[in-house]
């Protein structure tokens, strides 16, 4: 092989390798999901929806109280574009808590109009203010539900909050919320276990 053919061949081989490797690397590039998982573990996120302005405002009020009383929770509102996105995030366990109107909660639990693709979602009720509920996935740790509920119940009268002990809207009450409402003592896990 002469020098010119060798250069042409090497250039062609390098181009072919680049054409094959670059798309492979792009398809297997760094994923943000690990950081998202870490973020979710560091911050107490309560989902609301931009399509429910009243629920979003309620979420802001509840999160402000949680931040004031539980600053280490790093509580924050996470706003989804619509209720279908809220359902998707709850269904796939990317979120643990959400503020839902009574009608959205009923529809989400029953797989009603707009939520057929997401039913069943394993949700339990924690709090009700008369128009909206705070719901949690069934796998929300007992002590997390207890602390959130107990903290919000400190302002139960001005926030019009109650824990529906018998369940509501087709959901059972979260055991941690029940314990907080009844004033039961709950042994918190050690820092190593949490």
Q: What do the predicted segments below correspond to?
A:
Residues 40-52, 78:
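Short, well-ordered beta-strand elements
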Residues 95-116:
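A ligand-binding cleft/hinge motif common to bilobed small-molecule-binding domains
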Residues 48, 126-144:
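A bilobed periplasmic-binding-protein/Venus flytrap-type ligand-binding module shared by bacterial periplasmic
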Residues 60, 83-98:
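Short helices/loops that flank or line small-molecule/ion binding pockets
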Residues 2, 8-30:
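N-terminal export signals
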Residues 71, 76-88:
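Short helix-initiation/N-cap motifs at beta->coil->alpha
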Residues 55-71:
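Short, polar/charged alpha-helical segment
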Residues 157-194:
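An extracytoplasmic/periplasmic, membrane-proximal ligand-sensing/linker region
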């Amino acid at each position: 092989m002469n020098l010119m053919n060798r250069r042409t061949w090497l250039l062609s081989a390098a181009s072919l390798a680049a054409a094959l490797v670059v798309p492979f690397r792009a398809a297997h590039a760094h994923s943000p999901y690990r950081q998202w998982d870490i973020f979710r573990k560091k911050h107490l996120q309560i989902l609301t929806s931009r399509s429910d302005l009243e629920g979003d405002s309620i979420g802001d009020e509840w999160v402000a109280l949680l931040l004031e009383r539980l600053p280490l929770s790093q509580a924050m509102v996470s706003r989804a574009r619509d209720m279908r996105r809220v359902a998707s995030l709850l269904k796939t366990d990317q979120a643990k808590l959400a503020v839902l109107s009574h009608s959205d909660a009923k529809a989400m639990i029953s797989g009603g109009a707009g939520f057929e693709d997401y039913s069943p979602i394993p949700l339990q009720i924690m709090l009700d203010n008369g128009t909206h509920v705070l719901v949690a996935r069934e796998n929300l740790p007992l002590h997390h539900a207890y602390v959130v509920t107990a903290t919000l119940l400190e302002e139960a009268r001005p926030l019009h909050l109650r824990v529906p002990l018998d369940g509501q809207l087709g959901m059972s009450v979260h055991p941690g919320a029940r314990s907080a409402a009844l004033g039961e003592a709950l042994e918190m896990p050690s820092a190593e276990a949490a």
